[in-house]
């Protein structure tokens, strides 16, 4: 029986009904003419969502259903562009028109919000021209911080710029996390992005792992508290037309990778639990599910030395179906991480399919195994013909495909995409990177600084002469010169040295792999000796960008003051040094005392390095901290 959604609006969320809350934006020259008395049920917003899903699903061919199960990258540019060489790919027109795909990850830098909104509108126009007119869901990796790696995230560009997630954890302010998520949501929606391929709630129990900066550290309680605010900020109390859906990753926790090596790569495919501590890594996912997480992504890794089969998590039925769905009660969408079926290239680097533990399976067999495990959608793949073949051969039933397609379609209806797929490009230009959002991000950058040491209370440098000379490394002289101080060429000429260093890492080859900071957490002996000469020559203030917990006992001992930062520009650094802002951050992880201690610790156990230089929660305050709530000094 048809339910009148006008009458039922007060119980819409409970009944599956949802009426439009805003008038849809319609691009010039286009009319949503399908909405008339003869429109099918799925096109009629007065029907309830479940009825609309049922109607649409019944109209779909197996080819159209198969297209929904794939979620791959989308490059800004001509819709018929197929790339070339190692960057060859199916054109957007082909993926939407021929492969029936409607889920895409925008994998380009955004340099102009208006133009990006116009581009996504063109994508939606193309989708509406298909037989069923299913709108596109556009997703993105994180875009609001300082990391630039096509496989994991993008620099903020035109968006407001905030600390990495690890910096929000250092700040330990749930309000700031909620505000960040609300701001990011508004900026995403403005350009047409409706899915966030984050938060990353892995516990950073292995200090060498290359992906710590997007986590909230190694404490499960803090991570769980902050991720709730994050999800609520993006989605609201309930997913709806004003939401950006989140994808919580990487189940069942990607932190305890063997020897800290990342499972994007074959040498890092193993995940290990020498402390028998899987349950600790599940705690953030339990919190996410309780907070309304609608989508979860397993990681590439395969568990070793556990009760589970040593195959990658998305191929692992006991992980996805028995643990995630049955034991934890998750009823939403499971999206695999990228590239589990097909070999390919990332940033020009050859990357075999991350089918760890099932490398011997054919592409067809891999697809079948992933579906059998309980996953709904294949990330980073564009192979719907495999699903069609599996159904036609009888290997996978169409009913099984319908289960996943129903979840995916329902989400599009809940987000309001069938009724309002377009965005206003002019509004995007006003919303994205507006002054208020930018100011909030800059304040968070400054507040998240962690003061590790402050010998003789050298910072803040508030009472220094205008003739003071600075030796600097790691940032441009123009930042100091804007304060009307002089920059000199050597430590011997300087009154103070200001140094900004990335946390140590061992460079790796390859276009993609080179961007993953991995290996040793300590500076090599040559670099230590070079730095020591500076520390012995002039009072030195050091900032270490802690994308991983650096092993720097020698810097703590020799420098006058040491900060940890987690994504900030040089203006933020100088504001903290000169006392315009005060550091409020607390360490979101232990700082190890040596690489020997790192190598001896157990990958799955938090706070497990011997005699850390500083423990989780360490962070000094200035002797005379600013009194205002914004931590600004007059």
Curated annotation (Swiss-Prot):
The active site is at residue 337. GO terms for cellular component: extracellular region. It is found in: Secreted. Keywords: Carbohydrate metabolism, Cellulose degradation, Glycoprotein, Glycosidase, Hydrolase, Polysaccharide degradation, Secreted, Signal. It comes from Aspergillus flavus (strain ATCC 200026 / FGSC A1120 / IAM 13836 / NRRL 3357 / JCM 12722 / SRRC 167). Beta-glucosidases are one of a number of cellulolytic enzymes involved in the degradation of cellulosic biomass. Catalyzes the last step releasing glucose from the inhibitory cellobiose. Glycans are attached at residues 90, 112, 219, 270, 360, 476, 484, 524. It comes from the Eukaryota. The keyword Secreted applies. The keyword Glycoprotein applies. This is Probable beta-glucosidase C. Belongs to the glycosyl hydrolase 3 family. Pathway: Glycan metabolism; cellulose degradation.
């Amino acid at each position: 029986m048809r339910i009148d959604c006008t009458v039922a609006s007060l119980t819409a969320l409970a009944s599956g009904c949802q009426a439009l809350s805003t008038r849809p934006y319609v691009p010039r020259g286009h009319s949503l003419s399908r909405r008339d008395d003869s429109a099918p049920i799925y096109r009629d917003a007065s029907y309830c969502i479940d009825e609309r899903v049922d109607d649409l699903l019944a109209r779909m061919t197996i080819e159209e259903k198969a297209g929904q199960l794939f979620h791959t990258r989308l490059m800004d540019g001509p819709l018929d562009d197929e790339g070339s060489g190692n960057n060859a790919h199916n054109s957007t027109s082909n993926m939407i028109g021929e492969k029936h795909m409607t889920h895409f990850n925008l994998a380009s830098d955004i340099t102009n919000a208006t133009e990006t909104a116009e581009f996504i509108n063109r994508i939606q126009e193309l989708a509406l021209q298909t037989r069923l007119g299913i709108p596109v869901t556009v997703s993105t990796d994180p875009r609001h911080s300082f990391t630039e790696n096509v496989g994991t995230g993008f620099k903020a560009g035109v968006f407001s710029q905030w600390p990495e997630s690890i910096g929000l954890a250092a700040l330990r302010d749930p309000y700031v996390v909620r505000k960040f998520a609300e701001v990011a949501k508004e900026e995403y929606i403005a350009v047409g992005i409706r899915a966030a391929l984050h938060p990353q709630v892995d516990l950073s129990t292995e200090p060498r792992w290359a992906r710590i900066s997007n986590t909230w550290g190694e404490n499960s309680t803090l991570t769980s508290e902050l991720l709730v605010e994050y999800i609520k900020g993006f989605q609201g109390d309930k997913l709806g037309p004003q939401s950006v859906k989140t994808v919580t990753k990487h189940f069942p926790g990607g932190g305890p990778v063997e020897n800290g090596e990342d499972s994007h790569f074959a040498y890092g495919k193993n995940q290990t639990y020498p402390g028998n501590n899987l349950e600790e890594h599940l705690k953030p996912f339990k919190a996410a599910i309780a907070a309304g997480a609608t989508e979860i992504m397993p990681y590439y890794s395969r568990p070793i030395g556990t009760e589970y089969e040593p195959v990658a998590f998305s191929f692992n039925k006991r992980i996805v179906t028995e643990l995630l769905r049955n034991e934890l009660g998750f009823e939403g969408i499971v999206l695999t991480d990228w590239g589990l079926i097909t070999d390919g290239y990332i940033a020009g680097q050859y990357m075999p399919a991350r089918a760890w533990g099932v490398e011997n399976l054919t592409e067809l067999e891999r697809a079948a195994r992933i579906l059998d495990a309980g996953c709904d959608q294949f990330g980073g793949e564009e192979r719907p013909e495999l699903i069609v073949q599996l159904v036609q051969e009888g290997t996978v039933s169409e009913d099984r495909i319908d289960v996943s397609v129903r979840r995916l379609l329902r989400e599009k209806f809940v987000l309001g995409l069938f009724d309002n797929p377009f965005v206003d490009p002019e509004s995007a230009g006003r919303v994205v990177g507006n002054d208020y959002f930018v100011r909030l991000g800059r304040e968070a950058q400054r507040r998240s600084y962690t003061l590790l040491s402050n010998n003789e209370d050298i910072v803040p440098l508030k009472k220094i002469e205008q003739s003071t000379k600075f030796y600097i490394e790691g940032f441009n002289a123009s930042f100091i010169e804007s304060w009307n101080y002089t920059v000199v060429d050597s430590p011997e000429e300087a009154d103070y040295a200001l140094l900004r260093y990335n946390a140590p890492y061992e460079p790796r080859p390859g276009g993609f792999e080179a961007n993953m900071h991995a290996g040793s957490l300590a500076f090599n002996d040559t670099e230590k000796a070079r730095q020591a000469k500076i520390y012995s020559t002039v009072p030195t203030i050091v900032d270490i960008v802690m994308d991983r917990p650096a092993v720097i006992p020698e810097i703590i001992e020799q420098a006058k003051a040491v900060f940890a930062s987690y994504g900030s520009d040089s203006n933020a650094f100088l504001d903290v040094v000169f006392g315009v802002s005060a550091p409020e951050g607390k360490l979101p992880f232990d700082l190890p005392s040596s690489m020997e201690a790192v190598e001896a610790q157990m990958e799955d156990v938090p706070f497990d390095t011997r005699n850390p230089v500083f423990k989780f929660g360490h962070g000094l305050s200035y002797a005379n901290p600013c009194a205002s709530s914004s931590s600004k000094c007059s």
